[in-house]
Amino acid sequence: PNYLYWGHSMIKQIKSSDIKKFIEVNPNTVLLDVRTEDEWNTVGKPDTKNLGIKSYFITISQDPSFIDSVKKSINKKEQVLVMCAAGGRSIIAANLLANEGYNTLNISDGFSGNGQDPGWKNLGLPSVIDR
C-alpha cells in the first residue's frame, strides 16, 4: 500500500479494487462510510453483507460527535476501512480515528472514484440505494 502523510500520522491507502483480497486476509475488518445521509440516499451505499463484513454509516460532515459515535459502534480491535466519495473526507476521518487508537485504512478512490481509480460503485462492488 501507499502511505500518505497527514499531520503526524501515516495512514495506509487501499483501492476499492483491493478490498476483497484485503478482507480475505483480514476478516476482522469493518467498513466506515463517512459521507452524508444525502449522499447515501441519492448515490447509494456500499453493501458489504456478501463480503462478510459489517458496514457503519457515520457522517463526519459538521458532526462534533463523530468520534464518540464511532467509539460507540466500532471496536478498536477491528481494522477500519474508511470511505467517502473520493478519498478526501475519509483521510481526515482515518487520521482522527488513528489518533484515537484505531487501525484505519483510507479507501483512496472512495465510493464514486477519484479521477485516477474508478471507486467502489464503478467497479461493480455491491451497493444499495435505500428508497
Can you name each region flagged by the protein language model?
Residues M10-T29, E37-Q79, S90-R131:
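Rhodanese-like catalytic fold shared by cysteine-dependent sulfurtransferases
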Residues D33:
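Conserved active-site aspartate in kinases
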